[in-house]
Amino acid sequence: MKNANGLPIPVELADLCDRKSTALLIYDMQVGIRGQIAGGDRIVERCSVALSAARRIGMRVVFTRHLSCPKAWMGSTQYRSAMSWQRTSEPSAVKPWFLRDAPATAIVPELLPTAQDLVLDKLAMSAFEGTPLAFALRDCGITGVAICGIAVEIGIEPTVRHATDLGFIPIVLGDACGSGHAEAGKRSMETMKFVGEAMITEVDTFAGLLARSWSSP
């Protein structure tokens, strides 16, 4: 930890790996998304390890779910996105895959939220856009956001950039982040490393630092 102008400046991962400084964000680990990702089961397993480590020390946990609006509430942007993802040129062929109570929208059973976890539904790619996430983090005095889930190139990179713009420090658990397109996911990870504002690590390192923070006097 460094200091400037009387303020702490976290520079090492260990500076943020404790229950007071950081929250764990599990991004869009939904039944209908897991099945679209190569290696989805592996990402679930890695997220589960991170989640168990966070819960063991009482770290705050937040889940996001991507929603689709009913067609009556789909506007131009939502139709354009859905047409792209569903590989159709006709708006009439679009199906709202992730309606609020649809089975595909549910969090995967291996990672079910508890009553102590925050679950936020969103329409945008960034976990901060249109949700109270930033307010909730600031209200709890949280600086760091450890992020895992699916997909790196679709929503995790935008969330990381948005987090930095809002004054939070993103921690990317790289081996717990899946991608729908391997090359695009790799480019996103390389871009985040190049920009340098996010801390990039792996789940086992993160879990070990959490355990150490809990056992330290």
Regions found by a protein language model. Give the residues of each.
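Active-site-adjacent betaalpha module
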Residues: 1-23, 49-52, 56-57, 74, ...
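A short alpha/beta connector and helix-capping loop motif
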Residues: 20, 38-54, 58-67
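Short beta-strand segments at enzyme active-site cores
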Residues: 26, 59-66, 72, 173
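A generic "binding-loop/recognition-motif" signal
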Residues: 29, 67, 152
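Short acidic, Gly/Ser-rich segments with clustered Asp/Glu that frequently serve as metal-coordination loops
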Residues: 30-35
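Short, solvent-exposed loop/turn segments at secondary-structure boundaries
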Residues: 36-40, 183-184
